[in-house]
Amino acid sequence: MTITPQHLIALLPLLIVGLTVVVVMLSIAWRRNHFLNATLSVIGLNAALVSLWFVGQAGAMDVTPLMRVDGFAMLYTGLVLLASLATCTFAYPWLEGYNDNQEEFYLLVLIASLGGILLANANHLAALFLGIELISLPLFGLIGYAFRQKRSLEASIKYTILSAAASSFLLFGMALVYAQSGNLSFEALGKSLGDGMLHEPLLLAGFGLMIVGLGFKLSLVPFHLWTPDVYQGAPAPVSTFLATASKIAIFGVVMRLFLYAPVGDSEAVRVVLGIIAFASIIFGNLMALSQTNIKRLLGYSSISHLGYLLVALIALQSGEMSMEAVGVYLAGYLFSSLGAFGVVSLMSSPFRGPDADSLYSYRGLFWHRPVLAAVMTVMMLSLAGIPMTLGFIGKFYVLAVGVQASLWWLVAAVVVGSAIGLYYYLRVAVSLYLHAPQQPGRDAPTNWQYSAGGIVVLISALLVLVLGVWPQPLISLVQLAMPLM
């Protein structure tokens, strides 16, 4: 097929991030300069974000058989770029204290965000697999970036081995789907399923294996075992990327797959996904109750959040509202996670060994960093789904979608899970206002709010509050992303 100027405009975010990768590589080869490479990375990601406006002007189109650029792709590309931008911003002060090579960090984040953009635009199982690998491979290096720390290296090895196993399940599942349907395009799969092929054992086995592979990447129960250890072992800025960009991109492509190929029409698939969602919500919240490490706590909480999102995915066939619910929920989850992990990154910067991730490190934070404590409180309330925060709007949407689709047992799980979650989120929030320990541990810099990372954290908190009270701009944006399907 012929690539026209319109196609190139539609691919602008992908091309800009790809070009930034090349520029940063050449810059590292020419001269190692931490500030220069960080600046180039941030400029590239910002340029890719701005280019989305031009992509919108070009309209929806199939660029290649592998990729479709439309409003849906633009929304998820934007969320991935925001998460990547925040990761680079949080990483800069952290890397200032890091004595080994600093510049490769940005290179790995850029390559991973390239994978995220590919996933957001994927319209074919081959693009889905390439995107997942492109986002996973740089994460092996990023998780083990503080390789002199035993925990970081252990987390990287654990993630690498389990990720390879999950990828093999995913690939074998795709092979079975191809053997039965003869096509890997989402639209062609939809036609095959529409022809009554959905109940073929080979096709169901293929989708079952794909659910195993994707369940690992999204850290859903029972494929979640890596999550708390990897979140704890990875440097704080990397945990930010893991919790946001990789989850959002992969969930976005799963949404598109389910939209084109109505796999959820199969009762067997719906029951399996329902059990996974139920187990993820309950188990994730119960395990977070006893955590004293804030990164492990956020790791378990991310399992439950993906469980909530799965409820909206199961309800996808019952109306467009579930697409809206996922868009709003993911935006709320993104800003809340960026704020929470941003505070951990600020407290852990510059690099001085293990991160400040013990709950004890945050005890009495209000008495010497009141604004930072207030930001962390807002993020905890949003993740808990308290009214007047963006997290509440997302959770309300998920409940509404569950009720609309008559998924009563999953609605009950969401309510019970939210009640359990309230306890451990408030436990973190309350500890910020207790008496500070006699010997204070790690602390954020006194001028943290003037740093780039501090500004990102403050903007996240502001968005969580403003969009929690007045969500209409976000809802309108998400609705704009839907008709172009």
From Swiss-Prot:
InterPro entries per UniProt: NADH-Q_OxRdtase_suN/2, ND/Mrp_TM
Enzyme Commission code: 7.1.1.-
GO cellular component terms attached to this protein's record: plasma membrane
UniProt topology in membrane: Multi-pass membrane protein
Record field: catalytic activity: a quinone + NADH + 5 H(+)(in) = a quinol + NAD(+) + 4 H(+)(out)
Example GO molecular function: NADH:ubiquinone reductase (non-electrogenic) activity
Keyword hit for Coiled coil: no
Keyword Glycosyltransferase: no
Subcellular location: Cell inner membrane
Record key words, sorted: Cell inner membrane, Cell membrane, Membrane, NAD, Quinone, Translocase, Transmembrane, Transmembrane helix, Transport, Ubiquinone
UniProt record, GO biological process: ATP synthesis coupled electron transport
TM annotation in the entry: 8-28, 35-55, 71-91, 105-125, 127-147, 159-179, 203-223, 235-255, 271-291, 297-317, 326-346, 373-393, 408-430, 455-475
Assembly notes: NDH-1 is composed of 13 different subunits. Subunits NuoA, H, J, K, L, M, N constitute the membrane sector of the complex.
Similarity field: Belongs to the complex I subunit 2 family.
Protein role: NDH-1 shuttles electrons from NADH, via FMN and iron-sulfur (Fe-S) centers, to quinones in the respiratory chain. The immediate electron acceptor for the enzyme in this species is believed to be ubiquinone. Couples the redox reaction to proton translocation (for every two electrons transferred, four hydrogen ions are translocated across the cytoplasmic membrane), and thus conserves the redox energy in a proton gradient.
Annotated protein name in UniProt: NADH-quinone oxidoreductase subunit N
Organism: Salmonella typhimurium (strain LT2 / SGSC1412 / ATCC 700720)
Gene that produces this protein: nuoN
